Design a protein with these regions (language model features):
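Long, contiguous N-terminal structural blocks used for assembly/anchoring
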Residues: 2-90
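Long, highly charged low-complexity segments enriched in Glu/Asp and Lys/Arg with interspersed Ser/Thr
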Residues: 140-148
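Amphipathic protein-protein interaction modules
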Residues: 74-141
Length: 148
């Protein structure tokens, strides 16, 4: 399992982590969702400098994600997986890579489903991921991570 996914599984003592643990216990934080969250923290910056700052993963973890944002991330991942179950299965990507690609594709990064060499399946997954709209993370005044 990638190190970033393992990092997200570590236990922390706060409300967001408590929610994450509860969701995982209910089977909602699967490898797709954990990889999606890991990718979000990896490729979103904290805006701590004029040039964008550091990737969130350097100073923040799933424990810092506001509960409402974490719920939305989980719901988005669950809905995407349900709506695209056949395509995801046909892609052969595996849950972790697919979760990673879902974040990248929906946010129009330079990589994603379309460059996985899976032909029409990649194109269709790209279309559905893009139709979910972008989700940008930011640090609130309370030092929690929020999504817009």
């Amino acid at each position: 399992m990638p190190e970033a996914v393992q990092e997200l599984r570590r236990t922390h003592e706060d409300e967001a982590q408590g929610l994450a643990v509860a969701l995982e216990a209910m089977g909602k934080l699967d490898d797709f969702t954990l990889a999606y969250i890991a990718c979000a923290l990896w490729c979103s910056n904290d805006d701590s400098t004029p040039s964008g700052g550091d990737p969130l993963e350097r100073k923040y973890s799933i424990a810092d994600i506001a509960p409402e944002t974490l719920r939305k991330m989980v719901n988005d991942c669950t809905a995407f997986q349900r709506a695209n179950e056949a395509l995801l299965g046909a892609s052969g990507l595996g849950a972790e890579l697919a979760g990673h690609d879902f974040w990248l594709t929906r946010n129009r990064h330079g990589s994603g489903f379309w460059d996985e060499d899976i032909g029409d399946v990649g194109r269709k997954l790209s279309e559905t991921a893009s139709s979910c709209g972008e989700c940008n993370l930011y640090i609130g005044d309370d030092r929690r991570i929020y999504g817009i």
